[in-house]
A protein has these predicted regions:
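A residue-level marker of the well-folded mature domains of exported/periplasmic proteins
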Residues: 1-171
Length: 171
């Protein structure tokens, strides 16, 4: 079963996650995964995930993002026989050990941020129309989110400053 912390339309990665799980199920000859969308009820995600574990109906529970780390840790401890996969959730980054029944992987957001910063630095130093002569670049996030502020933001700044240490990054 897959718990989407949001809705499928919120993030293209959610759709890719579901399609990947469906493809894997087809290749393995097992049932298609149940997909549960958490919607906008952020406080209810853990309860939904817990209900999936309590049902003991699924070999594997899958969820996504740093917003689910604490819930995954709690439910993994309550149901040590339940296999859980946490995509793009940083358990180690919050100083916790990954439980034996959890597979956790994190996207290398710092690489994305660094390359984005390099690109912004190259643009601002260029002679392209509207390039900022003041060597100033900006980074805009749609929300404050740990993977973004802990990894992308500092890496973006490092990438921009690798082009020119005088570049100012505005966040």
């Amino acid at each position: 079963a897959i718990l989407i912390p949001g809705t499928l339309g919120d993030n293209p990665i959610f759709q890719m996650m579901v399609e990947g799980a469906q493809e894997a199920a087809a290749e393995l000859g097992v049932s298609e995964p149940k997909v549960v969308e958490g919607g906008d009820d952020y406080a209810g995600y853990e309860k939904l995930f817990l209900s999936l574990a309590e049902s003991k109906s699924y070999d594997l529970l899958i969820t996504y993002t740093d917003s689910m780390v604490e819930s995954v840790l709690k439910i993994a401890a309550m149901y040590p026989e339940q296999k859980i996969q946490l995509l793009d959730g940083d358990i180690i980054g919050i100083g916790q050990e990954v439980p034996s029944n959890v597979y956790s992987c994190r996207f290398k957001n710092e690489d994305l941020g660094y390359l984005g910063g390099c690109f912004a630095g190259l643009l601002t130093k260029s002679d392209l129309p509207y390039a900022n002569e003041d060597l100033k670049v900006g980074l805009i996030f749609t929300d404050i989110y740990p993977a973004w502020t802990n990894y992308i933001q500092p890496a973006f700044e490092n990438g921009a400053k690798s082009i020119d240490p005088q570049i100012e990054v505005v966040f």
